[in-house]
Amino acid sequence: MRSGGRGRPRLRLGERGVMEPLLPPKRRLLPRVRLLPLLLALAVGSAFYTIWSGWHRRTEELPLGRELRVPLIGSLPEARLRRVVGQLDPQRLWGTYLRPLLVVRTPGSPGNLQVRKFLEATLRSLTAGWHVELDPFTASTPLGPVDFGNVVATLDPGAARHLTLACHYDSKLFPPGSTPFVGATDSAVPCALLLELAQALDLELSRAKEQAAPVTLQLLFLDGEEALKEWGPKDSLYGSRHLAQLMESIPHSPGPTRIQAIELFMLLDLLGAPNPTFYSHFPRTVRWFHRLRSIEKRLHRLNLLQSHPQEVMYFQPGEPFGSVEDDHIPFLRRGVPVLHLISTPFPAVWHTPADTEANLHPPTVHNLSRILAVFLAEYLGL
């Protein structure tokens, strides 16, 4: 990712699991004597709104008519909340899911393929019966053609709408001879969080799938987020650009395509360092950011967060330090509502060899898993 601005018919599973598609209002005249003051007021209001919206709207958010369709639901009862939190397993998150990801996994490398297969196998092993698809493709890069592959897991592909959680699993390429870069925060921890959430809520998700809930959970593990040479529109976001374009072409009921089925796109990036701060980047999804903030407060009051001395430490009010180019951009440009959970300012270890397991802060990782688990349970009505 790169920081900028002021401061990133239905789907069918092929034999090999590769993604492929199935075959003006009336106006009333006003008295002339009242028209001039009204026009003046409108002009002043319009100018103010133009200035405000240009400042307040984040990177390339499109003012499309499609709005979030799920109303805010009630908070989980305390007993249910405690059960959800209790189903998370910090040792499983760390040992089973995170450590296998802490390898060099640049696009096209053996480590990248190893991690991709690990993600696919883990998702297929869950009781809920996820619909797991691969999106392999070859793209032109400054280094020549490179093979990439996204992993897409949808709990119920027949559901009308999707709550989509996404992260990238590739690691940044450094020159030969450099210290190996494993990208613990960038983005091994986000990938491990998604796997742990799916495992911890496995039974609840199975039940939701059996009941044909109208909104289902979808997980995207994206390849090629990092630039291979120098960040630019053609050298970055390879996986998200390819997948967003593909999803835009695949029909989905009630339609018209799978991109429209995404009700909320939550992107996780740069997580795992101590004392992260998150800001709402887009007015369109601020209600969901506030929900995360409320969950953080509630878990703190219930003494369910570790190394968390203040009621709110993570989800901060106010404006972010600047816009960030990241894997949400291709989806945002297609009108998808985005909630970007990225630590800003970036962790001190960002894009350095120090972005390792040793510099992660386990209490923060586990706190985030608890906040996200409660958010999913409330959003999906689990």
UniProtKB/Swiss-Prot annotation:
GO terms for molecular function: glutaminyl-peptide cyclotransferase activity; zinc ion binding. Its EC number is 2.3.2.5. The active site is at E225 (proton acceptor), D269 (proton acceptor). It comes from the Eukaryota. GO terms for biological process: peptidyl-pyroglutamic acid biosynthetic process, using glutaminyl-peptide cyclotransferase. It catalyses: N-terminal L-glutaminyl-[peptide] = N-terminal 5-oxo-L-prolyl-[peptide] + NH4(+). Its main location: Golgi. Pfam families: Peptidase_M28 (PF04389). It is a single-pass type I membrane protein. It is found in: Golgi apparatus membrane. Disulfide bonds join C167-C191. Keywords: Acyltransferase, Disulfide bond, Golgi apparatus, Membrane, Metal-binding, Transferase, Transmembrane, Transmembrane helix, Zinc. GO terms for cellular component: Golgi membrane. PANTHER family: GLUTAMINYL-PEPTIDE CYCLOTRANSFERASE, GLUTAMINYL-PEPTIDE CYCLOTRANSFERASE-LIKE PROTEIN. This is Glutaminyl-peptide cyclotransferase-like protein.
